[in-house]
Design a protein with these regions (language model features):
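Ribokinase/PfkB-type carbohydrate-kinase core domain
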Residues: 1-103, 158
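Conserved post-catalytic alpha-helical subdomain immediately downstream of the catalytic base
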Residues: 108-159
Length: 159
């Protein structure tokens, strides 16, 4: 682990797949040790991993990570086991948009070509804007970007 790179980051973005290997668990544990210096975000990734990784998830959420993100089903599944797991929560609501804490933004109605990468686009764009814009505008721009990703065949917009 390159400590100086981690410490120079605005956010550390980790996910539930990280908890599927010993090295991944070590990386997550280390990241939580420096959470006072770098904001930590954690993605739930898949509902099946929530129960599978429950013991490690409990350790993570005792640390009150900065932003938890996932889709509605993942957030609901997690709440069956752990309540109030993060300081902030970003929820992807699919074609209905997204929610950040108490802020809801609806997505534009489109013909979806492929939703692959939309969740990653949502969190990536939101994090890119969150330090520069107020939360509602950052979320609005993130939903707009994720919507555009759904209009192409692939997870990235070509520039």
């Amino acid at each position: 682990i390159n400590i100086s790179e981690l410490l120079s980051s605005d956010f550390l973005v980790l996910d539930n797949f990280s908890l599927s290997s010993r090295k991944g668990i070590e990386t997550v544990e280390y990241s939580l040790q420096i959470k006072d210096e770098v904001r930590v975000c954690f993605g739930l990734s898949d509902t099946s991993l929530i129960q599978e990784n429950y013991e490690n998830l409990k350790k993570i959420f005792l640390n009150k990570i900065d932003i938890l993100f996932g889709n509605e089903a993942e957030i609901i599944k997690l709440q069956e086991f752990i309540s109030n797991p993060a300081m902030n929560t970003l929820v992807s609501k699919g074609s209905k948009g997204a929610k950040y804490n108490q802020i809801n933004i609806e997505a534009s109605k489109i013909d979806v070509v492929n939703s692959n990468g939309a969740g990653d686009a949502l969190i990536g764009a939101f994090l890119a804007y969150t330090d520069f814009l107020e939360d509602r505008l950052a979320l609005s721009k993130a939903v707009s970007y994720a919507t555009k990703v759904c209009m192409i065949n692939g997870p990235r917009l070509l520039t």
